[in-house]
């Protein structure tokens, strides 16, 4: 599987697409893949999850939603991946770029940039088919890359001016 094929599979149809619809669409697409392709897909997904495991990206999640747990941050990174390669690469390079995203999935009238268990779909399909798990791929570093973001409002506004304007706190 190429990275282009991977991104074609994971990219949502619109930024505000419903999370359940998004996960169902990915599951349907992945069900057509061979076991080898599922392994390749899972490997690339893991690589992208590790690539976005940084304090600067976590700081963006914090500004948008107050994201303060590893689990929520993993769901946020799944959301970034679901935006597609162009948005994903921009945000990994400069997390404040996410402030330029105009449409967001919502829950109770608030931005909800999380996709629950999007990263597990390939593994679940593989297990259903084979009664075995996908090969284990180490997750990488124990802590996010880079310098931890400051929780101080003044510093957050300076570091994430676009996001702070879009999501005032």
Positions of the model-derived regions?
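Secondary-structure junction/capping motif
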Residues: 18, 69, 112-116
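Core of folded catalytic or high-affinity ligand/protein-binding domains
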Residues: 28-106
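Phenylalanine-focused residue identity feature
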Residues: 6, 41, 45, 73, ...
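N-terminal domain-start signal
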Residues: 1-56, 154-168
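Long, solvent-exposed, polar/charged low-complexity segments
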Residues: 7, 130-169
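An amphipathic alpha-helical core segment
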Residues: 101-149
